[in-house]
Protein backbone atom coordinates (compact mmCIF):
# COMPACT_ATOMS: atom_id res chain seq x y z
CA UNK A 1 0.00 0.00 0.00
CA UNK A 2 3.01 2.28 -0.46
CA UNK A 3 1.16 4.03 -3.29
CA UNK A 4 -1.47 5.34 -0.83
CA UNK A 5 -0.77 8.53 1.12
CA UNK A 6 -1.69 9.07 4.76
CA UNK A 7 -4.71 11.15 3.72
CA UNK A 8 -6.13 8.24 1.70
CA UNK A 9 -5.33 9.63 -1.74
CA UNK A 10 -2.99 7.95 -4.16
CA UNK A 11 0.57 9.20 -3.77
CA UNK A 12 1.06 12.21 -6.04
CA UNK A 13 3.21 11.85 -9.16
CA UNK A 14 0.98 9.12 -10.62
CA UNK A 15 -1.40 11.39 -12.55
CA UNK A 16 -1.56 14.56 -10.47
CA UNK A 17 1.70 16.50 -10.07
CA UNK A 18 3.83 16.16 -6.96
CA UNK A 19 2.82 18.98 -4.61
CA UNK A 20 4.36 19.18 -1.16
CA UNK A 21 1.59 21.25 0.42
CA UNK A 22 -0.38 19.02 2.84
CA UNK A 23 -3.99 20.14 2.39
CA UNK A 24 -6.00 19.20 -0.69
CA UNK A 25 -9.52 20.34 -1.46
CA UNK A 26 -11.90 20.77 -4.38
CA UNK A 27 -12.09 24.48 -5.12
CA UNK A 28 -14.86 24.18 -7.69
CA UNK A 29 -15.82 22.81 -11.05
CA UNK A 30 -17.62 23.42 -14.33
CA UNK A 31 -19.74 20.95 -16.31
CA UNK A 32 -20.93 21.19 -19.90
CA UNK A 33 -23.60 18.69 -20.93
CA UNK A 34 -23.53 18.37 -24.73
CA UNK A 35 -25.95 15.46 -24.81
CA UNK A 36 -27.29 12.97 -22.31
CA UNK A 37 -25.82 9.49 -22.21
CA UNK A 38 -28.28 6.86 -23.37
CA UNK A 39 -29.05 3.57 -21.64
CA UNK A 40 -26.61 0.82 -22.71
CA UNK A 41 -24.39 3.36 -24.47
CA UNK A 42 -20.69 2.66 -24.03
CA UNK A 43 -18.64 5.58 -22.75
CA UNK A 44 -15.05 6.39 -21.92
CA UNK A 45 -13.41 9.18 -19.93
CA UNK A 46 -10.18 10.93 -20.86
CA UNK A 47 -8.51 13.09 -18.19
CA UNK A 48 -5.81 15.67 -18.82
CA UNK A 49 -4.09 18.30 -16.69
CA UNK A 50 -4.84 21.70 -18.22
CA UNK A 51 -2.92 23.97 -15.87
CA UNK A 52 -0.83 24.17 -12.69
CA UNK A 53 -0.46 27.57 -11.06
CA UNK A 54 1.13 28.78 -7.82
CA UNK A 55 -0.37 31.70 -5.90
CA UNK A 56 -0.06 33.33 -2.49
CA UNK A 57 -3.11 34.11 -0.38
CA UNK A 58 -4.05 35.13 3.14
CA UNK A 59 -3.64 31.51 4.24
CA UNK A 60 -0.17 31.17 2.66
CA UNK A 61 1.05 29.38 -0.44
CA UNK A 62 -1.52 27.85 -2.79
CA UNK A 63 -1.16 25.52 -5.78
CA UNK A 64 -4.10 25.34 -8.19
CA UNK A 65 -4.41 22.34 -10.50
CA UNK A 66 -6.99 22.32 -13.30
CA UNK A 67 -8.01 18.90 -14.61
CA UNK A 68 -10.23 18.34 -17.66
CA UNK A 69 -12.39 15.19 -17.85
CA UNK A 70 -14.07 14.42 -21.17
CA UNK A 71 -16.75 11.75 -21.32
CA UNK A 72 -17.50 10.48 -24.81
CA UNK A 73 -20.20 8.08 -25.92
CA UNK A 74 -20.62 5.93 -28.99
CA UNK A 75 -21.84 8.93 -30.94
CA UNK A 76 -19.58 11.72 -29.74
CA UNK A 77 -18.99 14.05 -26.80
CA UNK A 78 -21.38 13.88 -23.88
CA UNK A 79 -19.99 15.63 -20.79
CA UNK A 80 -16.97 17.85 -20.15
CA UNK A 81 -15.92 18.52 -16.56
CA UNK A 82 -13.33 21.07 -15.46
CA UNK A 83 -12.14 20.11 -11.98
CA UNK A 84 -10.37 22.76 -9.91
CA UNK A 85 -8.16 21.38 -7.14
CA UNK A 86 -6.26 23.52 -4.64
CA UNK A 87 -3.37 22.49 -2.41
CA UNK A 88 -2.64 24.69 0.58
CA UNK A 89 -0.69 24.91 3.79
CA UNK A 90 -2.16 23.55 7.02
CA UNK A 91 -3.80 26.39 8.99
CA UNK A 92 -2.74 27.23 12.51
CA UNK A 93 -4.43 25.16 15.21
CA UNK A 94 -7.55 26.82 16.56
CA UNK A 95 -7.98 29.02 13.49
CA UNK A 96 -11.67 29.70 12.82
CA UNK A 97 -13.19 29.74 9.33
CA UNK A 98 -13.73 33.20 7.86
CA UNK A 99 -17.40 34.15 7.48
CA UNK A 100 -18.62 34.92 3.94
CA UNK A 101 -21.76 36.87 3.13
CA UNK A 102 -24.35 34.99 1.05
CA UNK A 103 -25.80 36.45 -2.18
CA UNK A 104 -28.15 39.40 -1.75
CA UNK A 105 -30.98 37.43 -3.32
CA UNK A 106 -34.35 36.11 -2.19
CA UNK A 107 -34.41 32.31 -2.40
CA UNK A 108 -37.44 30.81 -4.12
CA UNK A 109 -36.82 27.49 -2.43
CA UNK A 110 -34.69 26.20 0.44
CA UNK A 111 -33.92 22.91 2.12
CA UNK A 112 -32.12 22.05 5.35
CA UNK A 113 -29.63 19.19 5.20
CA UNK A 114 -28.44 17.25 8.24
CA UNK A 115 -25.16 15.60 7.20
CA UNK A 116 -24.11 12.37 8.88
CA UNK A 117 -21.27 9.84 8.53
CA UNK A 118 -23.43 7.46 6.47
CA UNK A 119 -24.21 10.12 3.85
CA UNK A 120 -20.58 11.19 3.63
CA UNK A 121 -19.24 7.65 3.43
CA UNK A 122 -21.72 6.65 0.72
CA UNK A 123 -20.88 9.73 -1.36
CA UNK A 124 -17.17 8.98 -1.00
CA UNK A 125 -17.81 5.43 -2.20
CA UNK A 126 -20.07 6.49 -5.08
CA UNK A 127 -17.51 8.99 -6.36
CA UNK A 128 -14.38 6.90 -5.61
CA UNK A 129 -13.11 9.58 -3.25
CA UNK A 130 -10.73 8.04 -0.67
CA UNK A 131 -9.96 11.29 1.20
CA UNK A 132 -10.11 10.36 4.89
CA UNK A 133 -11.44 13.73 6.06
CA UNK A 134 -14.89 12.65 4.84
CA UNK A 135 -15.23 9.36 6.75
CA UNK A 136 -12.41 8.95 9.31
CA UNK A 137 -13.35 11.18 12.24
CA UNK A 138 -10.19 10.63 14.36
CA UNK A 139 -8.01 11.44 11.34
CA UNK A 140 -10.07 14.50 10.37
CA UNK A 141 -10.00 15.93 13.89
CA UNK A 142 -6.64 14.85 15.30
CA UNK A 143 -4.43 14.92 12.23
CA UNK A 144 -6.01 17.65 10.10
CA UNK A 145 -7.51 19.68 12.95
CA UNK A 146 -11.09 19.89 11.70
CA UNK A 147 -14.03 20.07 14.17
CA UNK A 148 -15.68 17.04 12.53
CA UNK A 149 -16.02 15.19 9.25
CA UNK A 150 -15.79 17.47 6.23
CA UNK A 151 -18.77 17.60 3.87
CA UNK A 152 -17.64 17.17 0.25
CA UNK A 153 -17.96 20.30 -1.88
CA UNK A 154 -19.18 18.19 -4.82
CA UNK A 155 -21.82 16.61 -2.55
CA UNK A 156 -23.20 20.06 -1.77
CA UNK A 157 -23.13 20.87 -5.50
CA UNK A 158 -24.99 17.62 -6.24
CA UNK A 159 -27.64 18.45 -3.62
CA UNK A 160 -28.09 21.90 -5.15
CA UNK A 161 -28.60 20.35 -8.58
CA UNK A 162 -31.14 17.98 -7.06
CA UNK A 163 -32.96 20.94 -5.50
CA UNK A 164 -33.07 22.62 -8.91
CA UNK A 165 -34.37 19.46 -10.60
CA UNK A 166 -37.11 18.91 -8.01
CA UNK A 167 -38.38 22.47 -8.35
CA UNK A 168 -37.97 22.56 -12.14
CA UNK A 169 -38.72 19.00 -13.33
CA UNK A 170 -38.86 20.03 -17.00
CA UNK A 171 -35.40 21.61 -16.98
CA UNK A 172 -32.47 19.97 -18.77
CA UNK A 173 -29.21 21.44 -17.51
CA UNK A 174 -26.81 22.66 -20.21
CA UNK A 175 -24.02 24.01 -17.99
CA UNK A 176 -23.33 23.95 -14.27
CA UNK A 177 -20.51 25.52 -12.29
CA UNK A 178 -19.77 25.80 -8.59
CA UNK A 179 -17.21 27.41 -6.30
CA UNK A 180 -16.42 26.29 -2.76
CA UNK A 181 -16.17 29.29 -0.44
CA UNK A 182 -16.10 27.88 3.09
CA UNK A 183 -16.16 24.48 4.83
CA UNK A 184 -19.15 22.50 6.08
CA UNK A 185 -18.95 19.78 8.73
CA UNK A 186 -21.17 16.98 9.98
CA UNK A 187 -21.45 18.73 13.34
CA UNK A 188 -24.37 20.94 12.25
CA UNK A 189 -27.07 21.41 9.63
CA UNK A 190 -26.62 23.51 6.52
CA UNK A 191 -29.16 25.10 4.20
CA UNK A 192 -29.54 24.88 0.42
CA UNK A 193 -31.02 27.87 -1.40
CA UNK A 194 -31.90 28.62 -4.99
CA UNK A 195 -33.84 30.70 -7.43
CA UNK A 196 -34.54 30.74 -11.16
CA UNK A 197 -34.55 33.77 -13.43
CA UNK A 198 -35.47 32.88 -17.00
CA UNK A 199 -33.32 29.95 -18.12
CA UNK A 200 -30.66 30.44 -15.43
CA UNK A 201 -30.48 29.40 -11.80
CA UNK A 202 -28.46 30.80 -8.92
CA UNK A 203 -27.82 28.30 -6.14
CA UNK A 204 -25.99 28.55 -2.84
CA UNK A 205 -25.44 26.82 0.49
CA UNK A 206 -24.96 28.45 3.89
CA UNK A 207 -23.92 27.07 7.26
CA UNK A 208 -25.74 27.54 10.58
CA UNK A 209 -24.17 31.02 10.93
CA UNK A 210 -25.63 31.97 7.52
CA UNK A 211 -22.07 32.10 6.19
CA UNK A 212 -21.72 31.22 2.51
CA UNK A 213 -20.18 27.79 1.95
CA UNK A 214 -20.71 27.19 -1.77
CA UNK A 215 -22.19 29.08 -4.68
CA UNK A 216 -23.31 27.68 -8.04
CA UNK A 217 -24.87 28.70 -11.34
CA UNK A 218 -26.77 26.64 -13.90
CA UNK A 219 -28.25 27.27 -17.32
CA UNK A 220 -30.94 24.98 -18.68
CA UNK A 221 -33.46 24.39 -21.44
CA UNK A 222 -36.93 22.81 -21.35
CA UNK A 223 -37.29 19.10 -22.00
CA UNK A 224 -38.35 17.97 -25.46
CA UNK A 225 -41.17 15.47 -25.98
CA UNK A 226 -38.68 12.66 -26.62
CA UNK A 227 -37.02 13.25 -23.23
Predicted feature residues:
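Hot-dog-fold acyl-thioester-processing enzymes
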Residues: 1-28, 92, 103-168
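Short secondary-structure boundary micro-motifs
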Residues: 13-20, 35, 53-55, 96-97, ...
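HotDog/MaoC-like acyl-thioester-processing domains
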Residues: 26-115, 184-187, 193-227
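Catalytic-pocket segment enriched in acidic/His residues
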Residues: 134, 140-215
Amino acid sequence: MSDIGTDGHAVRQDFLPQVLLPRRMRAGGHFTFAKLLEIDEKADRVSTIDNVEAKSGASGQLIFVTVRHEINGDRGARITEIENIVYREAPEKGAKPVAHRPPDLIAQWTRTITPDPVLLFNYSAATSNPHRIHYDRPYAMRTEGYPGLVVHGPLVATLLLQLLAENNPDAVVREFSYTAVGPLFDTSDFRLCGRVDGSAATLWAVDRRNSLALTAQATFRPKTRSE
